[in-house]
Amino acid sequence: MAIVKRGVRTKNKQSQQPSKSGIKKAEFDLHKKKEVGVSDLTLLSKIADDAINDNLYKRFMNSTIYTYIGHVLISVNPFEDLGIYTPEHLNKYKGKNRLEVPPHVFAIAESMYYNLKSYGDNQCVIISGESGAGKTEAAKQIMQYIANVSVDDQVSAGGDGGISKIKDMVLATNPLLESFGCAKTLRNNNSSRHGKYLEIYFNPSNYQPVSAHITNYLLEKQRVVSQITNERNFHIFYQFTKHCPPQYQQSFGIQGPETYVYTSAAKCINVDGVDDSKDLQDTLRAMQVIGLSQDEQDNIFRMLASILWVGNVSFVEDDNGNAAVRDESVTAFIAYLLDVDAETLKTSLIQRVMQTSHGMRRGSTYHVPLNIVQATSVRDALAKGIYNNLFDWIVERVNLSLQGSGAVQEKKSIGILDIYGFEIFEHNSFEQICINYVNEKLQQTFIQLTLKAEQDEYVQEQIKWTPIDYFNNKVVCDLIEALRPQPGLFAALNDSVKTAHADSDAADQVFAQRLSMVGANNAHFEDRRGKFIIKHYAGDVTYDVAGMTDKNKDSMLRDLVEVLSTSSNSFVSQVLFPPDLLAALTDSKKRPETASDKIKKSANLLVDTLSQCQPSYIRTIKPNQTKRPKEYDNNQVLHQIKYLGLKENVRIRRAGFAYRTTFDKFVQRFYLLSPKTGYAGDYIWQGDDVTAVHEILRSCHIPDSEYQMGTTKVFIKTPETLFALEDMRDKYWHNMAARIQRAWRRYIKRKDDAARLIQSAWKNKTHGNQFEQLRDYGNGLLHGRKERRRMSMLGSRAFMGDYLGCKYSSGFGRFIMSQAGISDSVIFSAKGDILLSKFGRSSKRLSRIFILTKNSLYVIAQTLVQNRLQVQKEFTIPVSGINYVGLSIYQDNWVAVSLHSPTPTTPDIFINLDFKTELVTHLKKCNPGLNIKIGQTIEYQKKPGKFHTIKFIVGNTAPVNGDSYKSGTVTVRQGLPGNSQNPKRPRGAAGKVDYSKYYNRGSNMRSTSSYQPPAVSKAPQSSRPSYIQPPVQQTQQRVVPPVQSQPKPQAQRYAPPDTQPQTQRHAPPDTQPHAHPEQAAQAAQAAFHHTAPQAQNTTQRKVPPSAPGSYGQQAPTQKPSAPSRPARKTAPAPPAKKNVAPPPPPAAASPPPKPKFPTYKAAYDFQGTGSASELPISKETIVFITRKEDNGWWLAKTLDETKEGWVPAAYVVECDPPANSPAGNAKSPPPPPPQLNSASQAQQSQQQAQAPNGAGLSNGLADALKAKKSEETNLAGSLADALKKRKGATGDSDEEDEEDDDDW
């Protein structure tokens, strides 16, 4: 993303709060293994080789083969299929950073692909380790992951563009090049006998894979003609000879592998775990995917057949002691396969053509016969030359298919290096020194890019750092490749070949003589007469001098090239052996390039390529030499741990930094995370990059210990911090979109609420309130026949019906519906009690849930089974089967539901319900023929055919707001007359619209981040903290303070509304406007079913009282404002100055008397719960505090000492006494009356004399309305207290008379 600078906007913007964090749904991983050891070696308590080895052993035996050292992956070859490369495992690593998932090669691949897309840097992975450690498999899995992920990203984005074809071709290179370039060795069944560097190129605009390229390094062509015992030739020869396609068997004369010398001499044809038939099918399929035509495939297999038959050419000695072909039919068949003259081919195998020259003149030509040894060498050179050129052509042909359209000029790449591992055999020759040289170069690259480069960078950037010693193998690389000041081994080989070009034995002797000069004063080299030792980083290796110079020549005899150039097959004469190759051999002025020159050039080019990329590292370890699973050789692994330098890597990683980048790149990447550097996606910072980096890190709350600032770069210490930054950046646009969506939804919600409010008001105006109409209908059913409760006669009482919220999509009511299996529409739902007689026991009053639908009345029971809530339908009573309902004439809540034909499963029920009148009303609506019996007694059938009568009496022993049941008798207090009517619903207090419910309640949440920074205090920008909000009325259980006459209040803290929203109180029913029926139902249910706790939880956390604004954060203390004073009169102008003595100073005013109680000011509005023991106060009201309790309640008294009550300690702050307080101005004349700006001052003015004028009349009317409202509030507020006392006396079981005990 390019930085586009824009000037700072002049519009004053509110500080944007971080978006509310979202938590992803947790998923249980069935395949997750138990963690064994540590997944990152930097977490080891002891840094030692033995500790590393022990940790790797534990994880290996648990089939956990991957471990991290920071961002370096350690892989131990399991020698078995663990099932960890399936598509399911691959999908688990998509879009995940390495800390979210277990260590895996897929995590390295994901990190490479993410860095490529995010930062635009070329990526590469360097896979190192000895032969058989699993390098090839790791490279294959990385290719598999990147190919799949890059294609999936483009397909999900809605486009393909041929990338699937590129993916298939990239993956097809694995089986094709493995067949032609890998073989079975003593250490590895699939050992790479060549080096391969695959680069996948991506379009930088959309990171779509557009092409690929493979670079080949030093094929071990000697393996074509000879192998060590129990090793094999290249895989393709066994695949071809064992399962040759039918069309090739006749035309190419292919037989079994035991027929040919090149495939049978090592006595190893079959390998355990290798299916040559399947591998051949994969190879043929890969050829088709890459795009090889049928003619090209025929020519490939023709060349393979030629090589096999060339190996079967044998020689005998003629009469002159020269070599002769034993069976000329074999050479004739080879000539047929190569399309050359048979006699010419035979002659080139047993004779050598030599030419002499004299200056510029052409000399003589000689035909020199060869002996058997020389002829065998020429035969093998022919086979090696054909296979080497064939392999090079296959790589070039694959690159031709992978190059794509080539329309994109600038490309980004991911490189995967799969190269031969370090080798130590009993006899080591030129191939081993080349392989080990390349591994030394890779080790040097690893050191330079990790250990040395990292420490050098810390010094250069002036970062605090403790240097760590390590072994730098540059001295070994110079021993092999150096030209000056002291020539290395490769230079000595080239000089030996140049000195004795014609005689290989003489050249070997010259090379042996030069070794003493090569290893002079070098501690890593030893000369051993015909052998020499090089002390590599992986161990000491002994090399044989014999045959090295001949292998270094790396060129075919001119005689053989001339024969092949005459082939009538263009694939042989033009493709494999083009004319320019013969011209180069003929030109005697130019020395042919040797094999050592090629490998040195290729290795240096590889190092240059890798140094231009951001590297990732995989260090592979071979656990044993037997290639058996679950076998761990401690000594062998410990040796690899030491020479790989894992201990030094762990030490540097623990002391180093996980991420570093230049200041400008960091700002360009993360400027969105700070409101000072980015706004709406634009870069608005006007300062330098260093300050911008500080602002970004400060805005993200990154501690100073997590980063250091260098001279040109910023260094992030832990990867967790980097992942947190990346996570916040990824979610930036999502949060911005969510913020816009919230604003739009608030706007729509506000319009919708306004429309609903208008519609509700209009419906109530024209048609009346349906819930109040239903209430009036129900009151008419009982009018004059039953005493009424005071709570039922409130003007705000309405029959809402569904008090449990069964109609909602979620919540308690919906839970009960789903558990009980009720699907019908609910008319009425509430909690209550039922009187049940148990077997052999007296009747007991039990809690139940009652749900009424159009057809049935359900009685729901809740039980705890093994601490789990079980909900079941206890009774299902059909509404049409109800004969009558029985009620008493008193104000109790009991009602009997009697059926026409009761059964044991559907009996008559005797229930206690706060909303009994409403239930009877709904039953009457559903069943118009229902009888309502009201009398002194209630009769119902406890069992079918057995009637039971309940008596009702009036007594003062009953609870004030309830009743008591004992032995078939219900005692209740006297209620309101039966002809009482509900007053009109009181109008809500006029005031401003509460827009706080439309505000963004998640605005105070920080941005989502896996990193949790410490809180950073900021200076407030206003006199009042922004996080303090007025209390929001909610229908939740309220806290009832104790009355003054009762003992000390319980340990219940009353916190301010901004710190404990869960304790916010709801308004009394008569003060809540019922704009929505659902909200009114919830409010009424919460009021009628409120029960006070019997005992407070003694383990509840106590919050010490403190001033508002200091709850968890630092807030400024707001001083109380002084009461308003009368306006001062303008002082008259001073008289003209005269020379008179100044008057004496006035006497000091007497200090105001100290009040007898400390004064406190209300920081919030406290409306109270309606209890008589509370003192409602308004904000800014000043009161006396006469008593302080430890439970959070303080006893307050108004300044005029006319009212006293309890207030929450967290709602008041200490302040100075006002100047007009009774204690503060007792000895001074009272000032003019202040303006009415508080509740206490309003009460004082109410007690003053009333003036008989219009103003006094209006004030009196206002006072009367306030008094009426206060009275109704107190009446409604005592509802919960009445219900609490009423229910408290009826919770236990009671004994019935003896008549009930014989029910069983």
From Swiss-Prot:
Residues 734-754, 755-780 form the IQ domain. Residues 1141-1156 have a biased composition (Pro residues). ATP binds at G129, E130, S131, G132, A133, G134, K135, T136. Residues 1-24, 963-1162, 1214-1304 are annotated as: Disordered. Residues 413-496 are annotated as: Actin-binding. GO terms for cellular component: actin cortical patch; cell cortex of cell tip; mating projection tip; medial cortex; myosin I complex; plasma membrane raft; prospore membrane. Residues 1292-1304 have a biased composition (Acidic residues). Pfam families: Myosin_head (PF00063), Myosin_TH1 (PF06017), SH3_1 (PF00018). One of its GO terms (biological process) is mitotic cytokinesis. Phosphorylation of the TEDS site (Ser-364) is required for the polarization of the actin cytoskeleton. Phosphorylation probably activates the myosin-I ATPase activity. CDD domains: MYSc_Myo1, SH3_Myosin-I_fungi. InterPro entries: Fungal_myosin-I_SH3 (IPR035535), Kinesin_motor_dom_sf (IPR036961), Myosin_head_motor_dom-like (IPR001609), Myosin_TH1 (IPR010926), MYSc_Myo1 (IPR036072), P-loop_NTPase (IPR027417), SH3-like_dom_sf (IPR036028), SH3_domain (IPR001452). The keyword Cytoplasm applies. Residues 36-730 form the Myosin motor domain. Residues 1029-1052, 1072-1096, 1120-1140, 1217-1227, 1236-1256 have a biased composition (Low complexity). It is found in: Cytoplasm, Cytoskeleton, Actin patch. Type-I myosin implicated in the organization of the actin cytoskeleton. Required for proper actin cytoskeleton polarization. At the cell cortex, assembles in patch-like structures together with proteins from the actin-polymerizing machinery and promotes actin assembly. Functions as actin nucleation-promoting factor (NPF) for the Arp2/3 complex. Belongs to the TRAFAC class myosin-kinesin ATPase superfamily. Myosin family. This is Myosin-1. It comes from Debaryomyces hansenii (strain ATCC 36239 / CBS 767 / BCRC 21394 / JCM 1990 / NBRC 0083 / IGC 2968). The lineage of its organism: Eukaryota, Fungi, Dikarya, Ascomycota, Saccharomycotina. The gene is MYO1.
